[in-house]
């Protein structure tokens, strides 16, 4: 929070094996406490009267909110693609969104909508399929689960 007050950066990302206050095994409550502290630091009044712009926190919850101890870990996209079940993927998105919200994080770098075309690619597991139509269907289902239905 001290660096946020000093530099007012607009966004930040937590990486793998990182946790609030240097504790990679921190519970969800510690993540939420840090989110609140960062929000307060980013919205604190500036000395020259300029408007304070809230920072946004991003996480890489591509198969559940896996940085948080106790969160649900779901199969990677390659396994979900094998099910060809958009409703399942939608429900996974909703469960992931609820767990992210409980930690105060605003932004998820998901879904991965890569279309794997070469099995030698090191991130093939992040693709639902080689079929672009299935990737589009399951990617849309995950977004709907994460964000809810448009009204």
Give residue ranges: language-model regions.
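Glycoside hydrolase catalytic-domain context in secreted enzymes
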Residues: 1-151
């Amino acid at each position: 929070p001290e660096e946020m007050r000093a530099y007012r950066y607009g966004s930040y990302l937590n990486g793998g094996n990182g946790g609030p206050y240097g504790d990679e095994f921190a519970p969800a409550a510690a993540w939420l406490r840090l989110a609140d502290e960062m929000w307060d630091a980013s919205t604190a009044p500036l000395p020259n009267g300029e408007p304070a712009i809230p920072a946004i926190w991003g996480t890489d919850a591509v198969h559940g909110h896996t940085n948080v101890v106790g969160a649900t870990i779901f199969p990677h996209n390659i396994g979900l693609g094998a099910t060809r079940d958009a409703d399942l993927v939608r429900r996974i998105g909703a469960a992931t969104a609820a767990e992210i919200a409980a930690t105060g994080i605003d932004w998820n770098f998901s879904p991965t909508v890569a279309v794997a075309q070469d099995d030698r690619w090191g991130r093939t597991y992040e693709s639902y399929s080689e079929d672009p139509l299935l990737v589009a269907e399951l990617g849309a289902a995950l977004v709907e689960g994460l964000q809810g239905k448009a009204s």
